[in-house]
Curated annotation (Swiss-Prot):
HAMAP family to which the protein is assigned, alphabetical: Ribosomal_uL11
SUPFAM superfamilies, sorted: Ribosomal L11/L12e N-terminal domain (SSF54747), Ribosomal protein L11, C-terminal domain (SSF46906)
Major localization listed first in the record, in broad terms: plastid
Species name: Cyanidium caldarium
GO cellular component annotations of the record: chloroplast; cytosolic large ribosomal subunit
Transmembrane spans: none
Pfam families referenced in this protein's UniProt entry, alphabetically: Ribosomal_L11, Ribosomal_L11_N
Protein function: Forms part of the ribosomal stalk which helps the ribosome interact with GTP-bound translation factors.
Subunit structure: Part of the ribosomal stalk of the 50S ribosomal subunit. Interacts with L10 and the large rRNA to form the base of the stalk. L10 forms an elongated spine to which L12 dimers bind in a sequential fashion forming a multimeric L10(L12)X complex.
Family: Belongs to the universal ribosomal protein uL11 family.
Protein name: Large ribosomal subunit protein uL11c
Molecular function terms, GO-annotated: large ribosomal subunit rRNA binding; structural constituent of ribosome
Cross-referenced SMART domains: RL11
Length: 141
């Protein structure tokens, strides 16, 4: 028998360090989900990716059970890790905070391609380049 989905909740949480405190508690508690069960399962599945923010898409069913899918970290997080910067710039056209090689952009595009609006690698690279430029990161060809 197919369970009926009552809602889908999207959360971006630190890998291996989720707690029942906000934002997890309020987001799942209002739907009657066992919060500790989610936290333990999420932390177990993201243990090897500590230090990253891993988005999770949680489907909550009528019987208060749930399933969740882990996504790849946001492109901005991957770009920050690749360049070693803490924060993006507030004025991307005027201020550069770092630089990244085209090869690193390609690697990030390969990681993110399944979650982007394209299946073409060259277009995925352009999307990641655009994100980098908007963060104040110059792309070295």
């Amino acid at each position: 028998m197919i369970k009926k989905i009552i809602t889908t909740v999207k959360l971006a949480l630190p890998a291996g360090k989720a707690t029942p405190a906000p934002p997890v508690g309020p987001a799942l508690g209002q739907h009657g989900v066992n919060i500790m069960m989610f936290v333990k399962e999420y932390n177990a599945r993201t243990e090897e990716q500590k230090g990253s923010i891993i988005p999770a898409e949680i489907q909550i069913y009528e019987d208060k059970s749930f399933t969740f899918i882990l996504k790849t970290p946001p492109a901005s997080i991957l770009l920050k890790q690749a360049t070693g910067i803490e924060k993006a710039t507030k004025a991307p056209r005027r201020e550069q905070v770092g630089s990244i090689s085209y090869k690193e952009i390609q690697n990030i595009a390969k990681i993110k391609i399944n979650e982007l609006n394209t299946k073409d690698l060259s277009k995925a690279i352009k999307i990641i380049e655009g994100t980098a430029k908007n963060m104040g990161i110059s792309v070295e060809t």
